[in-house]
Amino acid sequence: MDAEFLKEPSNAGHLYQQVGLIFQNSDIQLFNTTVAEELAFGPRQLGLTEEEINQRVNDTLALLEIEHLKERIPYHLSGGEKKLVAIASVLTMNPSVLLFDEPFNGLSPKYQRIIVELLEELKTAGKTIIISSHHFDQIASIVERVLLFSEEHTITTSYSKMDWENHPEQRKAFTTC
């Protein structure tokens, strides 16, 4: 995908199917009456059959080990449970690129570990993962490249994972911001 591809309005549908965004605040992403309906919403918009939708919902619930939440109201869940449901709602769409905005904010250590393990699984499965985070230590095992941005939102420095690991002064400055 490049700028020319994105300029063509007919390509918008393709982009929506290929890229999934998980918001920092899960409350703004969740709006259905049950977790099952939340997970079914995206695939339903793609025009999939109910059989395929149910299969995706059940597979994703199992992948994230949240089958017990299936009939719960999303707004009544804990912060960590909401984050998993928000991620699951995107995974049911099976995008090739996943954008995570501050995936660890406000989560207990238990849910932070669960999210890290999930990100590692998704990476192993071949998904492209882009993470905006101030918690580098938690994502160090996942990332292949680190981009540092200025206050003007421009890239100031780009490191490969190996370069990043060889610059402890930059890591220290970044992880103490």
Identify the meaning behind each predicted range:
Residues L98-D101:
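Catalytic Walker B motif of ABC-type/P-loop ATPase nucleotide-binding domains
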Residues I87:
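Hydrophobic anchor residue at the start of the ABC signature
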